[in-house]
Amino acid sequence: MERTFLMIKPDAIQRNLVGEIISRIERKGLKLVGAKLMTVPQALAEEHYSEHTDKPFYGKLISFITSAPVFAMVVEGEDAVDVSRHIIGKTNPSEATPGSIRGDLGLTVGRNVIHGSDSVESAQREINLWFKEEELSSYEAPRDTWLYE
């Protein structure tokens, strides 16, 4: 099974959207295998967003992501990266499809409620950055036989 990294951002935490977001992810057949509520250390935020260091929004992004708790998680399922990207929606909530997490709950590009890995390679890098292997729990759920061929 494929895994991906998702992070519910501070704006969603402050708006009490964690339960709704997780519910949408689970209803799509993805299984939560690791999760933690945490305040992000500066160094972790900088490493996570290292690809954006030269962009004008970088400083604000780091300040935002370290300003309040996030809910970091790893989910597992068939095509987990693509499935999660689809239900998350486009980065800009005004361009995201209605029914997607960002389309329904996001406010602006800077307050778009959730981060999701954009590729299998990014997912692996981000999972390794945020979680130790012993913090992840793979398991078989009875529903798996109904979800996957």
Curated annotation (Swiss-Prot):
One of its GO terms (cellular component) is cytoplasm. The keyword Nucleotide-binding applies. Belongs to the NDK family. ATP binds at K9, F57, R85, T91, R102, N112. Major role in the synthesis of nucleoside triphosphates other than ATP. The ATP gamma phosphate is transferred to the NDP beta phosphate via a ping-pong mechanism, using a phosphorylated active-site intermediate. The gene is ndk. This is Nucleoside diphosphate kinase. InterPro entries: NDK-like_dom, NDK-like_dom_sf, Nucleoside_diP_kinase, Nucleoside_diP_kinase_AS. It is found in: Cytoplasm. Homotetramer.
